[in-house]
């Protein structure tokens, strides 16, 4: 189980990471990492960076069951 300080240190070393990357690196369940990141965001320690992939050439996102959410990446970085 990782602490808030370990999450902060990992972000400091890596620059920016996705929650699933943090979860794998720290060997901590992703729901716990998500909760920690949201708490750190509320404290003003980290910032959420959302990127939408504009490279969907086929336009199949409309028919995809996951929709545009599958093309969206969410990164976390220290403030």
From Swiss-Prot:
Matching Pfam families, A to Z?
A: FeoC
Q: What are the binding positions for iron-sulfur cluster in this chain?
A: 56, 61, 64, 71
Q: Which InterPro entries match?
A: FeoC, Tscrpt_reg_HTH_FeoC, WH-like_DNA-bd_sf, WH_DNA-bd_sf
Asked if the Swiss-Prot or TrEMBL record annotates the protein with the keyword Cell division, the reply is no
Gene3D superfamilies in UniProt: Winged helix-like DNA-binding domain superfamily/Winged helix DNA-binding domain (1.10.10.10)
Database matches in SUPFAM superfamilies: Winged helix' DNA-binding domain
Keyword check for Cytoplasm: no
Keywords, A to Z, come to:
DNA-binding, Iron, Iron-sulfur, Metal-binding, Repressor, Transcription, Transcription regulation
Q: Name one GO molecular function term.
A: iron ion binding
Q: Which residues form a coiled coil?
A: none
The family line of this record is: Belongs to the FeoC family.
What role does this protein play?
May function as a transcriptional regulator that controls feoABC expression.
This protein's name: Probable [Fe-S]-dependent transcriptional repressor
Q: Which organism is it from?
A: Klebsiella pneumoniae subsp. pneumoniae (strain ATCC 700721 / MGH 78578)
Which gene specifies this protein's sequence?
A: feoC
